[in-house]
Amino acid sequence: MPHRSDPSPSSRDAVAATLRAAGCVFAEDEADMILAAADGDPGAVDRMVTRRAAGLPLELVVGWAEFGGRRILVEPGVFVPRRRTEFLVEQALALAPDASAVVDLCCGSGAVGAALAAALGAVDLHAADVD
């Protein structure tokens, strides 16, 4: 069976319709992300759509979140990094633009530390959480 890298428009439309019916405001964008994450596996699409329609955050469904221009891997049990948290990164950079060390305690996914390290360049990064 040939592998299709691009889902058919009807598949995208069907996924978007299901997501929209479940209350997802950006259903088309979410459908694109789910279809890309599923990589052509119809079973994976079905599982992801079911999980998203049940209310699981999109980032946990696809396994990553965009934060500070980077893809941060996420999984259940870790808070999903949110765009509004990027404000914290901006403030830290404004207060210490030449920092040589970053300490990210209770780091969760490590998004804040990773974003700071990426922005600062050569930095000594220490990130820790309870798990």
Question: Which residue ranges define each predicted feature?
Answer:
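Conserved AdoMet
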Residues: 28-94
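A residue-level detector for conformationally permissive "hinge/kink" positions
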Residues: 15, 47, 61, 100-102
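Secondary-structure boundary/capping residues
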Residues: 27-28, 61, 101, 125
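Aromatic-enriched hydrophobic runs in primary sequence
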Residues: 21-23, 30-31, 41, 46, ...
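Conserved SAM/SAH cofactor-binding pocket of Class I
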Residues: 84-131
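A short N-terminal interaction module
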Residues: 2-46
